[in-house]
């Protein structure tokens, strides 16, 4: 069904459902904006229901829009991943792309479904809006005193930064060998490998860097999801207090 192309884009069944979910979600956001106090793109806010509604359905303008938009977003993301599966199978490729994308979906679900379910109310979900979302992040940080002390957050941020560094190095080495000076020949992979062996003593290779990149990216998404799921459902105190175990550690050098 819908097995055709529009220009270079493959449509497919899940392409159609992706467009339907996306269109409905955008329409609901515009509806919430039209009924709200402002059209300022920075201040548009689609808030989750009040905590008093628990895990039930809320009235449209009291969080119901947020619930419907969330359903549309989940449907759109899942259909997009299934579209990637469909295209990969047609081309005889592996399913590495939808597999990696599924970790991004998991990170989103952690914010708007998994954590609210564990805490017993949809009101614990993240709002939709630029400034409102930043305020929500800030409030979560203050709620746990110093969120940067969250060990899962530390691991996630480490993977994010390492991913940026790895692919910054990868992209720059590709550009450097393919853009030689005037009168010089284009260099090959042997020059790439030699450069990194000279600089850091080891070259992971052209295939290895992409395997590493996938690992770093999905690890960053996974641990970012874990860090927010832990905060509230499994740990309610300030995150600096979690590290008190180190003070009682037999081989601690502190104190």
UniProtKB/Swiss-Prot annotation:
Keyword Repeat attached: no
GO biological process: photosynthetic electron transport in photosystem II
PROSITE patterns: REACTION_CENTER
One annotated Gene Ontology cellular component of this protein: plasma membrane light-harvesting complex
Membrane-topology descriptor: Multi-pass membrane protein
Localization: Cellular chromatophore membrane
Coiled coil: none
Residues bound to Fe cation: 170, 210
SUPFAM superfamilies named among the record's database cross-references: Bacterial photosystem II reaction centre, L and M subunits
Keywords, sorted A to Z: Bacteriochlorophyll, Chlorophyll, Chromophore, Electron transport, Iron, Magnesium, Membrane, Metal-binding, Photosynthesis, Reaction center, Transmembrane, Transmembrane helix, Transport
Entry binding sites for a ubiquinone: 196
Domain of life: Bacteria
Binding-site list for (7R,8Z)-bacteriochlorophyll b: 133, 153
GO molecular function, one term: electron transporter, transferring electrons within the cyclic electron transport pathway of photosynthesis activity
The protein's role, per its UniProt record: The reaction center is a membrane-bound complex that mediates the initial photochemical event in the electron transfer process of photosynthesis.
Record-stated family: Belongs to the reaction center PufL/M/PsbA/D family.
Subunit structure: Reaction center is composed of four bacteriochlorophylls, two bacteriopheophytins, two ubiquinones, one iron, and three highly hydrophobic polypeptide chains (designated L, M, and H).
Name recorded for this polypeptide: Reaction center protein L chain
Species annotation: Pararhodospirillum photometricum (Rhodospirillum photometricum)
